[in-house]
């Protein structure tokens, strides 16, 4: 019997992610490109996974797109919401997951999962950039520390400062003022991470926390935010190895299920 190859394409606001699965369970290739919808990112991510998997797009049996820019991808057989795809991808990685906190480039989502992995309900904030990946990108530029180094730097802090502004624009001004006063960079970064964690934890508490708590999305790679989140919630947080790829993984899993249904 021939192998079945499916691809999930997660086109976010700030990054493009792809996962190719073989027979609905084996990850053959994956890619993350740090530009999202409306850019060359999706095409580059797709080209990358196909090259790694030694496949052409014609070799794929089914493709599902998800994310902010899911409707912009013409080759998809189906589009599925990122909420469902994140839930599916996280549960595939760890079937003990019951609460999923996903911090994206422009929004924050908290998902509640059933024991079966089905998405029960969700709460999200997409009205303000504060607490999102975009917020961290802005702060990274202001303090001149690469965004992927923020987490490690935050752990060096002995005296985290307080960022009181909840608006990105005002928080940026506040950080600039604190820099001018000579506040240590690591203390500022720790304060920034704590500010993100506080905002996200507030949303998560409104949803209700049930263990296991899993953090998904690119911000999950920021150890400073993760540690601050654990302190805010008073419990450990599980981070999957490929946290930024959970949406694309879920989309590829849905692609496999859809192909099987349509074939039967």
Swiss-Prot record:
GO terms for biological process: L-phenylalanine catabolic process; L-phenylalanine metabolic process. GO terms for molecular function: enzyme activator activity; hydrolase activity; iron-sulfur cluster binding; metal ion binding. Pathway: Amino-acid degradation; L-phenylalanine degradation. Keywords: Hydrolase, Iron, Iron-sulfur, Metal-binding. SUPFAM superfamilies: Actin-like ATPase domain. [4Fe-4S] cluster binds at residues 128, 167. Pfam families: BcrAD_BadFG. Its cofactor is [4Fe-4S] cluster. Its EC number is 3.6.1.-. It comes from the Bacteria. Binds 1 [4Fe-4S] cluster per dimer. NCBIfam families: CoA_E_activ. Involved in the fermentation of L-phenylalanine via a Stickland reaction. Required for the activation of the (R)-phenyllactate dehydratase complex FldABC. Only in the oxidized state, FldI exhibits significant ATPase activity, which appears to be essential for unidirectional electron transfer. This protein is extremely sensitive towards oxygen. Homodimer. This is (R)-phenyllactate dehydratase activator. It comes from Clostridium sporogenes. The lineage of its organism: Bacteria, Bacillati, Bacillota, Clostridia, Eubacteriales. The gene is fldI.
């Amino acid at each position: 019997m021939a192998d079945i190859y499916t691809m999930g394409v997660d086109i976010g606001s700030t990054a493009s992610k792809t996962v190719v699965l073989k027979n609905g369970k084996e990850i053959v290739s994956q890619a993350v490109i740090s530009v999202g919808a409306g850019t060359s990112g999706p095409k580059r991510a797709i080209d990358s996974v196909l090259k790694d998997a030694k496949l052409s797009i014609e070799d794929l049996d089914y493709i599902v797109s998800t994310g902010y820019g899911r409707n912009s991808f013409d080759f998809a057989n189906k589009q599925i919401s990122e909420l469902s795809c994140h839930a599916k991808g996280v549960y595939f990685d760890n079937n003990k997951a019951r609460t999923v906190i996903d911090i994206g480039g422009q929004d924050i989502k908290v998902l509640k999962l059933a024991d079966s992995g089905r998405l029960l309900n969700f709460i999200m904030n997409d009205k303000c950039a504060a607490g999102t990946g975009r917020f961290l990108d802005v702060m990274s530029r202001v303090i001149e520390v690469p965004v992927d180094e923020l987490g490690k730097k935050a752990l060096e802090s002995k005296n985290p400062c307080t960022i009181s502004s909840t608006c990105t624009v005002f928080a940026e001004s506040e950080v600039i003022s604190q820099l001018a006063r000579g506040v240590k960079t690591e203390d500022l970064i720790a304060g920034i991470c704590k500010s993100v964690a506080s905002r996200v934890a507030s949303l998560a508490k409104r949803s209700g926390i049930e263990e296991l708590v899993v953090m998904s999305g690119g911000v999950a790679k920021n150890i400073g935010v993760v540690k601050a989140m654990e302190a805010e919630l008073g419990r450990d947080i599980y981070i999957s190895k490929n946290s930024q790829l959970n949406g694309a993984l879920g989309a590829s899993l849905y692609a496999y299920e859809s192909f099987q249904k349509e074939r039967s």
